[in-house]
Amino acid sequence: MSKHSHFRDKKMFQKKAEQFKKFQERISVQFQNEKLLYQAFTHSSYVNEHRKKPYEDNERLEFLGDAVLELTISQFLYAKYPAMSEGDLTKLRAAIVCEPSLVSLAHELSFGELVLLGKGEEMTGGRKRPALLADVFEAFIGALYLDQGLEAVVTFLKAYVFPKIDDGAFSHVMDFKSQLQEFVQRDGRGILEYKILQEKGPAHNREFEANVSLKGEVLGVGSGRSKKEAEQHAAQEALAKLQKHHMKQ
């Protein structure tokens, strides 16, 4: 099937082709088989309204993309957090690939503008529907995998997803104090000590600063709206420092 045959008419083809061209330039990805790219953004409602045309919706690509996304995220987390338990790795991965996270990524990359929808779905606001956008993101990952392989998917995720993990966007599901404790105990390094360094701000907007030390050496410092949050951030910094040192050995 040609690229042109995926659209209703020549005018629509030219408009969409230009949109997809700019999209690929923006994300620094060039599909070898653009039919896969178009399919990733084709909703079943569009196919149902054009049964006489050989259109394919994105549902099979979504199925594949879901598995590819879980694999690549799992590989990244396994390498990045050597002290994290299987249970915590699973929770973190779930937070990264859950619908709200994928919708946020889809919005960030303007996926909604490219989706091909049936008239009925369009009229009922389907273009902004969270589940639809999450599905399109997974379908895009599946299409990229088929077009260029796992390495291309990892390169894309390095640009748009992995930095968010590094920046702590999903830290709300992570218990850094427990991870740090496990890391230290595993190597028999000693006992961790947490200390609240200061409290500042009015009672309704208090901020705490804490550090964590091992055998007198400060490993991390953190701040937060509660003592617990400050200690978690201190543990996060300490864990990152110890893991970086561990990986260099």
Curated annotation (Swiss-Prot):
Binding site for Mg(2+): E62, D135, E138
Presence of keyword Protein biosynthesis: no
Cofactors named for this entry: Mg(2+)
Family matches, as PROSITE patterns: DS_RBD, RNASE_3_1, RNASE_3_2
Primary site of residence: cytoplasm
Subunit structure: Homodimer.
Entry protein name: Ribonuclease 3
Encoding gene (name): rnc
